[in-house]
Amino acid sequence: TVSNNLNLPHFAPKAKRIIYLFQSGGPSQHDLFDYKPKLNEMKGIDLPESVRMGQRLTGMTSGQSNFPLVGSATNFKQYGEARAWVSDLLPYIGKISDELCFIKSMHTEAINHDPAVTFFQTGSQQPGRPSMGSWLSYGLGSLNKNLPDFVVLLSRGTGRPKGQPLYSRLWGNGFLSSLHQGVQFRSAKDPVLFLKNPESLSKQERRKMLDYLSELNEEQEKKFGDKEVSNRISQYEMAYRMQTSVPETMDISDEPENILKLYGPNANKPGTYAANCILARKLIEKDVRFVQLYHMGWDQHSDLPMQIKGQANDVDQPTAALIMDLKQRGLLEDTLIVWGGEFGRTSYGQLQTSLSKEDLRVIKAGKYGRDHHPRCFTIFMAGAG
């Protein structure tokens, strides 16, 4: 009956896992996905008051005496059956655009990086709430007992290597159990800190220590009734299993040459976005519930035409490869991929000078940037049916 179906979704949910390719810093939608030929024609014209309508501008350009409009720093081309407009900076993503759902109406109230990133990770600008991956772990449970439900990977962009810092609270569990916090896998010799046994300690000795420690913790739990004690026991056991599962997962030496080629020239360089995309696929194959990639360096306040080329080159081929690799393995059907940052960039240029007579010269020389723009920007999704 109708009454029995009121709580059912219109379509059966397919997503079991998520890969969030977070582009930290705020990618410029004008130079990647949002084709505006009229804006190119208006290059150098001051932002019309009919558009601004007295709205507050973000801090780094609020002191400019003028706001010259700047079109895209690159050309655009239409791709696929959907004829999606994609920048020449992203040819690989353009070629798979029919696999993508572009959302060009994103909006946020945050105008600075930290509250904006925090909002996208937790649903609140105030720090301390559980992150998205923690909620998925809490609500859906684990699919793999040998790896965390929620894994975090970080990479730095070549466009602006010294990007905005990221903090571990972005993948924190907040008021949820510590079982649901994200675990960062690093590209260094020890992917997870303090996971390896000291050289003088054998695996058998470690097992005996954990068994004894578990007995002590169980006594503490009976005495005080604190659930975090049992959580600690579970975390010690997970760490023990991860001593085997993490090195196996982080090792990409057995990836076929054609797969490494698919992900691009940086695929076998640990810590790069390309290498992390391969690791994301491996984690999804092992049924990790939520994989969070952060790629830093998208904060182009100056020298945007040059910096954004490096950033786009970092992510273009690996992102497309990840989507198609999951598809050919039958994993895209129940894996949701999200690509995007914390806000967009302004349609006017951020200048190092406020002299109007120099605006056009600065823009033509490519020495401009774009300020933060929270009111409208673009992300895309793929997969999950």
Regions found by a protein language model. Name each.
Residues 1-385:
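Ligand-binding pockets and gating/stacking loops
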